[in-house]
Amino acid sequence: MSEKLVEVKDLEISFGEGKKKFVAVKNANFFIKKGETFSLVGESGSGKTTIGRAIIGLNDTSSGQILYDGKVINGRKSKSEANELIRKIQMIFQDPAASLNERATVDYIISEGLYNFNLFKTEEERKEKIKNMMAEVGLLSEHLTRYPHEFSGGQRQRIGIARALVMNPEFVIADEPISALDVSVRAQVLNLLKRMQAEKDLTYLFIAHDLSVVRFISDRIAVIHKGVIVEVAETEELFNNPIHPYTQSLLSAVPIPDPILERQKELVVYHPDQHDYTLDKPSMVEIKPNHFVWANQAEIEKYQKEL
């Protein structure tokens, strides 16, 4: 699991030009190992979805590189290169209702990728693939003739998962796949994603703002704040030893089930102006083995004393 499947180097993503230019992501650096679940965590508007959409090619990049299996995939691509990436990289979207064609049957929605890339030889083979995928995500074959509005939110998300996985991808970007779902079905969808990963040897980029969910499913976590990745570490290391003040703030806001402990805990308030980067510029530094933090030299010395 040590092989790097995805690598992001000095990535910047901006929108607009001139005075209206807005930099959504800057200096993003991370890698995703083959077979692991790597999570991007941050508040709404932090840029996490923007990065995910850039990897799959839905957002253009301003500078930097995105590498997939050692090859640069951002920028201009030929049609054959783009098609190859679509085969290998799929996305599960946040809102299952908005991401499914309301006028199409479930059969067509899941089969669309198979049709576009000629991934079957006979109609019988296509039907068998769709039937097997429906069973794998916990849906019935009689659901194939129905339309998305006839399903619950959890069932619609399962359809979205089936649509992505029927392409037999290597890498799946899950953009807050459970945030629009009822609490009662969130665990079911998470368990489904974990099971499918184990069975199909998938690599996940899991985008979320709920740290408790991320802890359950992730191998490593990157914390992003206003377009800047401030900390990257293995899951338990990040939860047990958060270094960046913003990460500490996020973790302190996670609810504790025990009401007595919840009332006693101290919230950490993050103040962005505590960082003085006027002269001493920050960079991503490996402060501990496999634990990276965005800091300048003065902050690194301070953090190391606190370890």
Curated annotation (Swiss-Prot):
The keyword Repeat is annotated on this UniProt entry: no
Residues binding ATP, per UniProt: G42, E43, S44, G45, S46, G47, K48, T49
Lineage summary: Bacteria, Bacillati, Bacillota, Bacilli, Lactobacillales
Entry keywords, A to Z: ATP-binding, Cell membrane, Membrane, Nucleotide-binding, Peptide transport, Protein transport, Translocase, Transport
Full protein name: Oligopeptide transport ATP-binding protein OppF
GO CC terms of this entry: plasma membrane
GO terms, biological process: peptide transport; protein transport; transmembrane transport
Subcellular location(s) per record: Cell membrane
